[in-house]
Regions:
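Eukaryotic N-terminal low-complexity, Ser/Thr- and Lys/Arg-rich leader segments
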Residues: 1-22, 320
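C-terminal hydrophobic helical "lid"/dimerization subdomain
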Residues: 3, 271-320
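Glycine-rich beta-strand-centered segment in the early N-terminal region that forms part
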Residues: 35-53, 64-106
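Short, well-ordered loop/turn sites that connect or cap secondary structure elements
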Residues: 93-94, 159, 243
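NAD(P)H dinucleotide-binding glycine-rich loop of Rossmann-like/cofactor-binding domains
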Residues: 102-169
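Mid-domain Rossmann-like dinucleotide-binding core that forms the NAD(H)/NADP(H) cofactor-binding site
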Residues: 139-216
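Glycine-rich cofactor phosphate-binding loops and adjacent beta1-alpha1 units
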Residues: 166, 192-195, 201-262, 268
Length: 320
């Protein structure tokens, strides 16, 4: 794949574009004449090999962040690919480097008009990291936004060795990474996580001591309470009933009067910090088994993502 760095760089590229707000099946169209993004001095130009979808992509597409958004837009935050050109101030990357990252440093504040669902895009050096050699492009693309969100959330609540955590939505893109980070990086004493019955074995394999079938068990009624509850599905009121006195709840879904809510600040530093865990296999990408979806099936991939039934991440590969 590194040979892509030697290919001529076109002035127009293929990309999935929406020019009005709505769900993907109504507004997302494949275009062949998307202007290639202009490279700034602190950016690299990436030949995209793989991308992953996130709920924030769908939220942007339906117009949830209109005030900070512009259309037409190519969606996509997570990217993995090959550097084909570097800006004059870039220090850590060179042409031919295999990189991955979350393209948007601030998820909701004027995100890039050309996201990862295009043949090429640009990204600031600081949001990228070198792709671990043992990960495929598809696996690498599945990680950045989810694992950076998981890591930042655990750090924000001061999670540390010996503490217990309950993960709401343990089989999702962020949840699968919270479990692994809590176990292998932060040293959790106990990890509970919720999912449907068919995904309980996955939770165990990732490191959960107490997998909970949310269709049968009300986690907030369990006699055991937790030092931290990480809400990745939008149930802060129930989460508050499951946390110990003096413990903390954090949510990534929606602001709440008494629960800390945060929006990820993307940084390649987190990916570099976690590199040893990826390379050792202690922390693994979780790619939904329905995929990867080919580039031509981006609309179908979004439709699947929007069911909220995906396991881990929905990945688009290869691109184009």
């Amino acid at each position: 794949m590194a040979a892509a760095a030697d290919s001529p760089i076109p002035s127009q590229i293929k990309g999935w574009v929406y020019s009005e707000y709505g769900k993907a099946s109504d507004v997302l169209k494949l275009e062949t004449n998307v202007p290639i993004p202009e490279l700034k001095e602190d950016q690299v130009l990436i030949k995209v090999i793989a991308a992953a979808l996130n709920p924030v992509d769908s939220m942007r597409m339906i117009g949830f962040f209109k005030v900070n958004d512009t259309i037409p837009t190519v969606p996509g935050y997570d990217v993995a690919g090959v550097v084909v050109k570097v800006g004059s101030q870039v220090k850590n990357f060179k042409e031919g480097d295999e990189v991955y990252g979350d393209l948007n440093e601030e998820a909701h504040e004027f995100p890039k008009k050309v996201g990862s669902l295009a043949e090429y895009n640009v990204a600031e050096e600081k949001v990228l990291a070198l792709k671990p050699k043992n990960l495929s492009f598809a696996e690498a693309a599945s990680l950045p936004l989810a694992i950076e969100t998981a890591y930042e959330g655990l750090e924000r609540v001061g999670f540390s060795a010996g503490k217990s955590v309950l993960v709401l939505g343990g089989a999702g893109g962020v949840g699968t990474q919270i479990i692994q980070l809590a176990k292998h990086v932060f040293g959790a004493s106990k990890i509970a996580a919720t999912s449907s019955a068919g995904k309980l074995d996955l939770l165990k394999s990732l490191g959960a001591n107490l997998p909970i079938d949310y269709t049968k068990v009300k986690y907030e009624d369990l006699p055991e309470k937790f030092d931290v509850v990480f809400d990745a599905i939008g149930e802060p009121d129930r989460a508050l009933k499951a946390v110990k006195e003096g413990g903390q709840v954090v949510t990534i879904v929606a602001p709440h009067p008494t629960v800390p809510f945060f929006v990820l600040t993307s940084t390649g530093t987190t990916l570099e910090k976690l590199r040893p865990y990826f390379e050792s296999g202690k922390v693994k990408p979780v790619v939904d088994p329905s995929g990867p979806f080919p580039f031509s099936q981006a609309v179908e991939a979004f439709s699947y993502l929007d069911t909220s039934r995906a396991t881990g991440k929905v990945v688009i590969y290869p691109i184009p």
